[in-house]
Design a protein with these regions (language model features):
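Conserved SAM-binding strand-loop segment of SAM-dependent methyltransferases
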Residues: 131
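Conserved SAM/SAH-binding beta-strand->alpha-helix loop
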Residues: 119
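Conserved class I S-adenosyl-L-methionine
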Residues: 85-95
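Conserved SAM-binding loop of SAM-dependent methyltransferases across substrates and taxa
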Residues: 96-109
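Short beta-strand element of Class I
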Residues: 111-114
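Conserved SAM-binding loop
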Residues: 126-127
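N-terminal auxiliary segments of SAM/dcSAM-dependent transferases
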Residues: 1-45
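Class I SAM-dependent methyltransferase Rossmann-like catalytic core
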Residues: 46-73, 77
Length: 131
């Protein structure tokens, strides 16, 4: 992550760059399919995020909101326990890593991080965004 920009700004910049590399029709198709999956019956036999286009579309339309929601919750926790800082972070079902960005925004500094998800494209994209 860029040490001179806030995690929120760095995330926004990374997502913009990712979208610049995805053809608009491909992004629109992926977003539409993802919306249908989330509004309908989500298949449980295979990851919803099947490929790079799906992961990018998901990151573009969901990651900022997820980041802000998790950051708000973590900020409340930090305000309640100001002397506590996590020694590490594990995110089960973490996808592209929005919660990890929220942890960094709330408690700056390095710590061990593990993000687990069955959608390899989401994990790969999360690593790319963080690089």
């Amino acid at each position: 992550m860029n040490e001179h920009a806030s995690p929120s700004e760095t995330l926004r910049t990374a997502l913009t760059a990712l979208l610049d590399g995805l053809p608009p029709k491909q992004a629109a198709g992926a977003v539409e399919r993802l919306i249908e999956n989330y509004r309908g019956t989500t298949p449980t036999h295979t990851p919803v995020l099947r490929d790079q286009a799906d992961a990018t579309a998901y990151a573009a339309y969901r990651m900022p909101a997820t980041f802000e929601a998790v950051r708000a919750a973590l900020t409340a926790l930090a305000d309640t326990a100001p002397d506590w800082t996590p020694a590490g972070h594990t995110d089960v079902g973490g996808g592209t890593g929005a919660a990890t960005w929220a942890v960094t925004a709330t408690w700056p500094g390095s710590r061990p991080v593990t993000v687990l998800d069955w959608a390899d494209p989401a994990l790969a994209l999360g690593r790319e965004i963080a690089a």
